[in-house]
Curated annotation (Swiss-Prot):
Assigned EC number: 2.4.2.17
GO molecular function term, any single one: ATP phosphoribosyltransferase activity
Native species: Thermoanaerobacter pseudethanolicus (strain ATCC 33223 / 39E) (Clostridium thermohydrosulfuricum)
Assigned keywords, A-Z: Amino-acid biosynthesis, ATP-binding, Cytoplasm, Glycosyltransferase, Histidine biosynthesis, Nucleotide-binding, Transferase
Protein name: ATP phosphoribosyltransferase
Database matches in InterPro entries: ATP_PRibTrfase_cat, ATP_PRibTrfase_CS, ATP_PRibTrfase_HisG, ATP_PRibTrfase_HisG_short
Pathway per the UniProt entry: Amino-acid biosynthesis; L-histidine biosynthesis; L-histidine from 5-phospho-alpha-D-ribose 1-diphosphate: step 1/9
Amino acid sequence: MENISIALPKGRMADSAITLFEKAGIAENILKDISRKLVVNDHKNLMKFMLVKPMDVPTYVEHGAADLGICGKDILLEQKKDCYEVLDLKFGFCKMVVAGPKEAKDSFLTNKRVATKFPNIAEEFFRQKGENVEIIKLNGSVELAPIVGLSEVIVDIVETGNTLRENGLIVIEEIFPSSARLIVNKASLKTKSQRIKEIIIKLKEVVETFKEV
C-alpha cells in the first residue's frame, strides 16, 4: 500500500479540514496535535499530514511534496497551479470582492489604483470590464490602503464583512464566491489512483451530508 501525504491549511480552515477527515474515518484522533507538530504520521494507515500556509498548499501539491491538499478556490484561481481540483468541500465560504469607501462606489475613475493580495484575479477582473487600473500588490491588511490613500479600492476575500465595516469600507462589487477545495497532484492520481480515489469517495460521502463543517 502506497504512502499518501496530505497538505492541510493553517488558519481559519484548519479545524474544518481536520473535522472533515475525522468524520470520513481517515486518521481518527491522529490530527489533534498537528498545530503543534506541523507534520503528523499515521503509520498504521501509511498517511502523512502536514499543516502549511493556505497560499502554499497548491505549491506542495503541484511539486508532489503532497499528494492531496485543501485550499480555497480563491487561491487556485490566483495561482493557477498545475494540479487537479476534484471536490468542493462546502466549508470556508467567503467572497472575493471589490471594496472601498462609499464615495468610491459613486465615482468613476479611469485610472484607479487597486490594492490586493490577489493581483492576477484583480487584473483579470478589471481587464474583462475594460477598466484601466494600477494593481498594487500587498501582503498585509489591504483594508488600510484606501484609508491612507495608497489606493482607491481593494480586491480581497470577505467572510463576514466585519473588518470592512470597522474600517469604513463597503463591498462595491462581488467577483466570485469561494470555498475550500480538494486538490490532487496529477502524477499521484495516476501512480496512487486506487488509494486517492478511496479517500475522495470517503470525503465526498461526508460532504454530501452537510452544507458547512
